[in-house]
A protein has these predicted regions:
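N-terminal [4Fe-4S]-dependent radical SAM core
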Residues: 1-24, 31-43, 60-61, 223-226
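Conserved beta-strand termini and adjacent loop/short-helix elements that scaffold enzyme active sites
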Residues: 7, 189-191, 227-229
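A secondary-structure boundary/capping signal
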Residues: 24, 71-72
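Short, charged/polar surface micro-motifs in flexible loops or helix N-caps
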Residues: 28-31, 87
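Conserved alpha-helical substructure of the radical SAM core
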Residues: 38-68
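Flexible, glycine- and charge-enriched loops at secondary-structure boundaries
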Residues: 47-51, 134-138, 204-211
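Conserved AdoMet/S-adenosylmethionine-binding subsite of the radical SAM
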Residues: 55-60, 64-67, 76-203
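Short acidic, glycine/proline-enriched helix-loop-strand junctions
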Residues: 195-229
Length: 229
């Protein structure tokens, strides 16, 4: 049974262009300092929502929502995710997924069930452990990215930018690398202090240069590119 740490009944931002409910899956193997859902990191949460209650809610929303996004945490950590997606799809909803690619093989298993993926690329490959606190996380993430690109599933590739963690040079390096790998839809988004448990990151989030200026230099690399500041 899927472990659910939270549920947003309606969102117009978690899946661009869609009205969706968001199911927050409990558990994540990474420890990103800027995480705005730190309560979802442990494998078990203090206030989990029974999966049957989530399904009951979704039945009441049939015909009112376009889709359901499985977010986290890291949804692909849970081996029950494919069955949960099938149950939601059987109710007539489209399926979205937020993931960092921590489990490439699990990701590959659910891609045939998914209509759209929001995939987080956190750093240049070699610098991943500095962000995630996990050795080998970069290799896992980029293996997951390649599976998404090969699948043909609609997606956007997103990078959260905090000036203490990623320099403009890092962002530019990442953009060129992603374009070379075949990424066509890219977003860079500013760090959000809400929910972040790292006081140092919250205090030192000011940028010397607006993120939009960095973004203007990268627009031509992708079919679609945007900055969420």
């Amino acid at each position: 049974m899927l472990r659910v740490g939270g549920l947003t009944p309606l969102s117009a931002t978690d899946w661009p262009g869609m009205l969706a409910a968001v199911v927050f899956c409990q558990g994540c193997p990474w420890r990103c300092g800027y995480c705005h859902n730190p309560d979802l990191i442990p494998a078990r949460g203090d206030s989990e929502i029974p999966w049957d209650e989530v399904l009951a809610f979704l039945r009441r929303r049939q015909g009112m929502l376009d889709g359901v996004v499985f977010s986290g945490g890291e949804p692909t950590l849970q081996t029950s995710l494919p069955d949960a997606m099938r149950e939601v799809r059987a109710l007539g909803f489209k399926i979205g997924l937020h993931t960092g690619g921590a489990y490439p093989q699990h990701l590959a298993a659910v891609l045939p069930l998914v209509d759209w993926v929001g995939f987080d690329v956190k750093a240049p490959l070699a610098d991943y452990p500095r962000i995630t606190g996990a050795a080998g996380s970069g290799e896992r993430a980029f293996a997951g990215l390649q599976k998404i690109l090969a699948s043909g599933v609609a997606h956007e590739i997103r990078t959260t930018v905090h000036p203490a963690l990623l320099s403009d040079a890092d962002v530019e390096e990442m953009a060129h690398d992603l374009a070379a790998r075949g990424v066509q839809h890219s977003v860079i988004q500013a760090f959000r202090s809400q929910g972040c448990g790292d006081e140092t990151l919250r205090r030192n989030a000011a940028r010397d240069r607006p993120l939009q200026e960095t973004g203007r230099e990268l627009t031509g690399l992708f079919e679609t590119f945007s900055v969420r500041a």
